[in-house]
Amino acid sequence: MIFFIILRTIQTFRTHQLHPFTESAENKSIMMTQIEKYANSRNKKEKERALCWLTTFGIQSVVSLKPSEDFLDIIKRHIEGRCDIQQIHLDTREYYHQVHHRSHSGELAHHEEADKVSVRIMELLEQHECGLSAENFSKTHRHMFHGIYHDSGKLRERPASKKEWVLSNSSVLYPSSDLIGDYLDRLFSIERAINYSQLSSSHRLHSYSSFIARLFMINAFHYANTRTAFVYAMQYMLSRGYQFKNDTFYREAWYFRNAMIRACYTNMHQGIYPTTEYMVMFLGNLFHDEDNELRNHRMVIKGE
């Protein structure tokens, strides 16, 4: 049964004034507001599922992807426990199979990636398991983007560089493509050897932050490295018993991306070295319900 009844007119995205992922209250859809209300539900399971969906939408927001209104309508059934994630997966796939007969617009392609990848991210987050290996990291990328990017799960084969707002248009120094496999194997080997039971709560967050940042810094794939690192990181921490306490990722995903970049960046001429302090503040809010003030402008490095 197809639960998407009609394809609603999708609201035009406005140009954000503060940064690409800021959304004003007046621009937020009524449907999204309803999803947010579930995150404050007294029903524990509803709240957990809603926070997972909001985290998923936060992850997608780093590339300005927003779910369609029809998709937001259908996931309410999952949040309320009336169907499982596999049913959402099937309905979404069938929905886009049907609407492709009527439209091939760029807006449709935008929402198709937003909706399909969101379902796949949710599938991964619900597993609450995460194999620490380069192979499983590649599988995460493949699961998220198969049928969307032709080289999903395939390691990068060319140089990588990207101007970053938080670095005043400088780039993190990414490893050459021929070293990616070795870097991943070494990183996972080191992480598997860490005995987290011997660390304090604060030191655990610092250790997780260091691992996540280094994973991001390898820039393993041709596309979607940020989203893949985000999803894998959340899979990993959920598998270790952490739980989302709030919608920090939904509201502050861009902050976390900037924090990862700062944890990877070195400029000895300016006296700038990698720091995980911003990542730890974010994770403290997300998993420990702390109240750290997350300000993007505090991370900005002035150009030379």
Task: Name each model feature, range by range.
Residues 2-304:
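FIC/Doc superfamily catalytic core
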